[in-house]
């Protein structure tokens, strides 16, 4: 995606370099300029919604969770109303982000679901409105339940 943004896009783009490196996505994933992408089978009951580096953890988690798929947001503002059509039959939606809860993308996503009549159970996994102390990326992801194992445990209702 970095190559696409730097060399192929005709419009302005923002490139960010996340601390700890870029996410590793499934080999068969290809960015197609859509507002969002589905990774896995969207007929499953559980959806993990995310963006950025957290996509890697979610993709790892769905390998261990039989009834889940990933919805990767490529565009976070404005959110596409087409998302509601994809999720209308989903039973549980977990929104995972490395951002704060209050005013974050997950709050906007919950509003989109509500406004479009998506009646799935919704859980927002993120950083509560608090100061995040300096630490390694891996330790912070674990602390805030955003690492792959925590995501597996959340989906399997162990957390």
Regions found by a protein language model. Name each.
Residues 1-7:
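Internal gly/pro-rich beta-alpha loop/helix module
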Residues 7-159:
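Thiamine diphosphate
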């Amino acid at each position: 995606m970095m190559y696409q943004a730097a060399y192929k896009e005709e419009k302005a783009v923002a490139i960010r370099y996340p601390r700890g490196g870029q996410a590793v996505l499934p080999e068969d994933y290809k960015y197609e300029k859509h507002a969002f992408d589905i990774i896995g089978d969207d007929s499953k009951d559980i959806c993990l919604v995310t963006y950025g580096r957290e996509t890697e953890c979610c993709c790892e988690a769905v390998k261990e969770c039989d009834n889940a798929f990933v919805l990767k947001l490529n565009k976070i503002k404005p959110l596409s109303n087409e998302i509601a059509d994809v999720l209308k039959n989903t039973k549980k939606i977990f929104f995972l982000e490395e951002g704060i809860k209050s005013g974050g993308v997950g709050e906007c996503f919950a509003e989109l679901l509500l406004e479009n009549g998506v009646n799935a159970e919704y859980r927002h996994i993120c950083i509560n409105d608090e100061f995040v102390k300096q630490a390694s990326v891996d330790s912070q992801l674990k602390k805030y339940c955003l690492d792959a194992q925590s995501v597996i445990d959340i989906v399997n209702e162990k957390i």
